[in-house]
Structure formats: C-alpha cells, structure tokens
Amino acid sequence: PFARCFEMKEACYAATPAIQLAKDYLAQRPNEKVLVIASDTARYGIHSGGEPTQGAGAVAMMISHNPSILKLNDDAVAYTEDVYDFWRPTGHQYPLVAGALSKDAYIKSFQESWNEYARRHNKTLADFASLCFHVPFTKMGQKALDSIINHADETTQDRLNSSYQDAVDYNRYVGNIYTGSLYLSLISLLETRDLKGGQTIGLFSYGSGSVGEFFSGTLVDGFK
C-alpha cells in the first residue's frame, strides 16, 4: 500500500504524459519503478460514424531506469492548439465528435510536432526503423504518414509503409482504446516485425482538444 497512485486524463493523450512524468521521476530515483496503465472504453452510438471503430482495452507498461525493451530518448516535442474536435460532456453516454475537424487537427498536430522535431534534432524519416501512431482507426495514422512521406527516399517509404501495417495489426482486432492505442500499436510492431536492438522507433501521441507529441525510443539489445 505504500505507493503513490493517481489518474491522468487528457483524452487519448494521457498515457504519454504519464510516461514522461515517470521518466522524469526516475531520473531522480533510479532504483524505483513506475507502473503506467493506459485504459479506456471507446463507446459510440448505434449506427453512428464512430461505431465501427469502438473498442475497449488496456496496456500496462513498467517504466524503469534500466529498460529491457525500449529506451526513451530525451527528444519529445509537443504541439498544443485549442480545438473543439471531440468531447464527452458530463452526463453524456457517448462522446460528441466533429469528425472532419478531428482528422484535420490530428494531421496538423502530427505535421507540426514532426517538423519541429526534425528541425530541433536534425532528423529525417530515414533515421527510423518504424513509426507508431495513435490509432483511432487504422487509416488515420496512415493518412498522417502519407502527409510527409514523399520527402523520404523510396527505400524509407517502403520500410515505413510496410512497418505501419505491422504496427496496426492488433489495433484492427481490438479497435480504438483511446489512451492505450499508441502503445497497443507499439506492442503489435514489436511482436510482428523483425526488428533489432539499436533501431529507433518514432512515436506520435495525440489527444483531442488538442495536444500532439512526437518522441522516439531506441530498442534495447535482446529486447525480444
């Protein structure tokens, strides 16, 4: 019982600041560990546009100073903008969604955070073995990737497009789980793609309202 336990809420983004907070905490307490649980239920009305995407699930992640799977890099770039694209008012069973606006906000948030990330850290798409996205539905991340991939060489385009399909394999079966969606995609990638220690994975987290964050992690040797 002698542990600190609290909840973070920010739409589909909440697990990412929880992980970043855990990372900062462990920088001062390297012998500790932090358990982050990303859990939610995406439920929509019958015959609504969101009904085919709905899902429920959770992803539990142990954050430690000596990771055995993925080492988070100190390179996160967040982008925030006031957008009323998705909300669930108190007392409402289902969320209210401005679908077209939400798609545009997602892609803009990705482009802005990625472009600033690339500028700050002098990176290109060729530096990544794969990119993982928040996946409200499986084509959403692909749309975001398509918006920047023409800047990459053909080999990089083929690799990122192919690895994206591996990364959303589990999401196709589970559906949208909101804040755990990005991390379910990461699990899917790690279990279905032939990756090696030392390779870099790019991650894009998004939450309506809105905030997006692009960051990366390096696979640990022997992570399999």
Stretches with model-predicted labels:
Residues 1-33, 150-181:
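Conserved catalytic cysteine-centered active-site region
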Residues 9-15, 38-43, 66, 205-210:
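Acidic, glycine-rich active-site loops and adjacent beta-strand->loop/helix elements
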Residues 111-129, 189-194:
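Phosphate/pyrophosphate-binding loops at sites that engage ATP/ADP/AMP, CoA/4′-phosphopantetheine
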Residues 187-224:
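Catalytic phosphate/nucleotide-handling subdomain of diverse soluble enzymes
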